[in-house]
Amino acid sequence: MKCTAREWLRVTTVLFMARAIPAMVVPNATLLEKLLEKYMDEDGEWWIAKQRGKRAITDNDMQSILDLHNKLRSQVYPTASNMEYMTWDVELERSAESWAESCLWEHGPASLLPSIGQNLGAHWGRYRPPTFHVQSWYDEVKDFSYPYEHECNPYCPFRCSGPVCTHYTQVVWATSNRIGCAINLCHNMNIWGQIWPKAVYLVCNYSPKGNWWGHAPYKHGRPCSACPPSFGGGCRENLCYKEGSDRYYPPREEETNEIERQQSQVHDTHVRTRSDDSSRNEVISAQQMSQIVSCEVRLRDQCKGTTCNRYECPAGCLDSKAKVIGSVHYEMQSSICRAAIHYGIIDNDGGWVDITRQGRKHYFIKSNRNGIQTIGKYQSANSFTVSKVTVQAVTCETTVEQLCPFHKPASHCPRVYCPRNCMQANPHYARVIGTRVYSDLSSICRAAVHAGVVRNHGGYVDVMPVDKRKTYIASFQNGIFSESLQNPPGGKAFRVFAVV
């Protein structure tokens, strides 16, 4: 007997055992038919996909996926002491949408996998809500044995008695507090050698990434007893919770349908590759903190009402006639570079100088040092001091809070040398919080890669500590997902700049 596509149900999840997938007879497939009919024209042909103004997931599906994740995370056993409330992230949604459009039954793209977690699900035949797959991921718990603290010496064992448990562990990974998903309709999708004519493909991306080898998915203990300080002691239904975090949703230009139409291949002459995905959110910044100045430039000329920290002086300033007023504290009409030579920060070969504005001084003392005679002045005026620019090599985990936190009126950080491959660093220990302006809890080097001031092969970075911000915005740039943060207690901020 011949069975049509409507009469069969196929349901699977990535990383199940690679074997033939059982089929079940479905007597009624009208729900899926109605859903798919919205994508056909009068002749029964599939529409060509429109420009991307819509999203590949509805508000209802978004909310149901999010609610189910938080419900499942709140009821883990043994109980979790540090399980964080999960929120929706539009950048993760966009990356999930991009991968869902590829219709490839594998994790990807490879450029993102070091920094995100990912669960996949697919079915065809009878309609299934996306929460069907979320629940199936969680149901792997029956095969998972939680590693208690006394078993972790120092690494925790991973015990899974079934085909796979990593979907479950990603769903309940305590620090994975952001999720974004997308749904796509894939024609003739290859699922482990079987061709599914109309596969409904669900991709969910998570950040920070879970499933780190040697770690338990969460800490066992009384709920909310080990929440990170950034949550301020907030707890909601056994989850670490910060007031207001559940009320933010990204703005939608237009409501979308449940299944995204696959783009026609007829009009697309460009073959997309994995490298296309890695460069979609590429950001490059050549903005420098260090300003190149001449021997004659005075701080008063170069710095009016802006934050001026670091200058690059040319060689030969000993021969300049530009005046310098004061000693130790220099008057604002002094030459920046000649004041630096006078104080001994640089020599006649030039170099970098850090400047700190010091407010008004009642007088300035003349002196002769390092071949430069300064002028005395017994009149109140604004002043500045000079200091040496040091260079320090750091790790991918080093933060501004550790190295050079902001202190009023200003702080100077050494010029930082970042190592290679910070994109692949563990985002739990090398967080990136913010966009353009970053929380000082962030990894300096991963923030620099995110901002585009240095590539993944490492290099020099200038860091400017600044006062705290009320809001840090999440984004996906250069292969790194940054976190959002609202009203952090106490912490300061920083910016990163290129060294050219």
UniProtKB/Swiss-Prot annotation:
InterPro entries: Allrgn_V5/Tpx1_CS, CAP_dom, CAP_sf, CRISP-LCCL_domain, CRISP-related, LCCL, LCCL_sf. It comes from the Eukaryota. Its main location: secreted. Residues 254-281 are annotated as: Disordered. Keywords: Disulfide bond, Repeat, Secreted, Signal. Transmembrane segments: none annotated. Gene3D superfamilies: CAP, LCCL-like domain. It is found in: Secreted. One of its GO terms (biological process) is face morphogenesis. GO terms for cellular component: extracellular exosome; extracellular space. Residues 289-384, 390-492 form the LCCL domain. The keyword Methyltransferase does not apply. Residues 1-23 form the signal peptide. Residues 66-206 form the SCP domain. Belongs to the CRISP family. This is Cysteine-rich secretory protein LCCL domain-containing 1.
